[in-house]
Each structure stands twice: as structure tokens, then as C-alpha cells.
Amino acid sequence: ADDVLAGIRAIKDEQEIALMRASASIVDTVLAEVAPRVVAGITEIELASEVDLRMRQHGSLGASFDTRVWGMGPALTRDASVRVSTDALAEGTGVSFDFGAITRGYCSDFGRTVHIGEPSAEYVTVHEVVMAAQEAARQAAVPGATSGQVHEAARRVIDEAGYGDGFRHRVGHCIGLDVHEEPFLSAEDTTPLQPGMLFTIEPSIFLPGRVGVRVEDVFLLTETGAVNINATDHELKAND
């Protein structure tokens, strides 16, 4: 019964898609407002709190999961599993955001990285690799392709660039009334994708003490391929 219900929930109707777009619009707006505050001296928890407040101000019923903000770079050697702290952020740090809104029960899930100061050559390179991995996964996400094939498309780009050790998770998941719904875009998942599914594509590269970059958008699968319902650009944002 659970499998049948998951299959029904995976395909969204037009009303559900409209609510998902509204939820995506909230997180786009919030990042645009919060990104300029990513400067040396601010703490991760301050940024996370600002995200949560602004999501509610823009109509979200709350966060679709605990908001995560964490820095990575030469000044921070901790592992990426620590997703928010009271640490003050320093110049030379890339600050990754992972958060989602809720619109009438329907969730969004979103991520970007904002750099404090001029990014190093490696940061720029890793950012380009992560964006290329997301695009490869998007192109692989066509009706009839399996969830695993989408994951492997992103994995291939990152492995070939030499950063495979820094990509430690599945590339995405379906999303709707729950922020994490089946099928999951993981190596072992053979579920065929169908039009009407909405799912995240969220590759990342995290190398403690060096660099951390993530991107996450929600995509709608149509008859001709995957369409990003988020509007935020994919440039590496750098604040002075």
C-alpha cells in the first residue's frame, strides 16, 4: 500500500505544481535578501535565523526542514556534517545554504553557496564542476530514464573532474507534501521518471579545510525534459 501511495503522490497535478512554484518563489526571494548579509563576522546561526524569519514574512508556514547554513574553506577544517553553528564566518569562506519553505502544505528545498571575499581559483573551479554536474543530471532526467541514471550523470562529471571523494550523497529526491519523497535519485534506484514528477537535483563537493560548494533546485519533469522551477541564477556570489 505504501508503494502505491508513493507512486500516486509522485505525480503532481496542476494545482499542486502551482503551489510548488509558489514555495520555490519564496526561497528565491529569501536568498536574494539574505545573501548580501554573508560577510566576515556574522555567524551561521544568525544567517539561519534570518532565513527562517524571512520565509515566514514572505508567506511560508515555516521551514520544510531545519535550515542549514555552514561555512567551508581554509579557515574551517570541520566536516560538512556540521550544518549550523555559532561560529563567526571569516573571509575566504564559502557559505552554503540549504533551506525550504512550505506553501499550503507543499515544500521547497533549495541551496546555493555565497563566498566571503574573492574566491580562490579552486573555489571557482569546484563551483563550475558542481554546476556542470547539476546540468548533466538535468539533461539525463527525461521520461523513462531511471532515478539512478540521473544520479550517475552527476556523479560522472564530478568523478571525471577529480573531486569524487567530495560528493558523498545521492543527487536528489522527489518532493511535495513531504520534503523527501520517493523515488530518490540515488545510484541504486531503478524507478523510471514520469512527467508530473518534481524532484531536487543537488550535487555538492565538500572538502574540509579547502572548499565547499552546493547547489539545489527543484525540477518539474515534462514530456520533453526537466524544467527548473527556481529562478535564482547559478553564478558564484562573492561579497566583499
Question: Which residues does each PLM region occupy?
Answer:
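Active-site neighborhoods and metal-handling regions in enzymes and metal-associated proteins
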Residues: 1-240
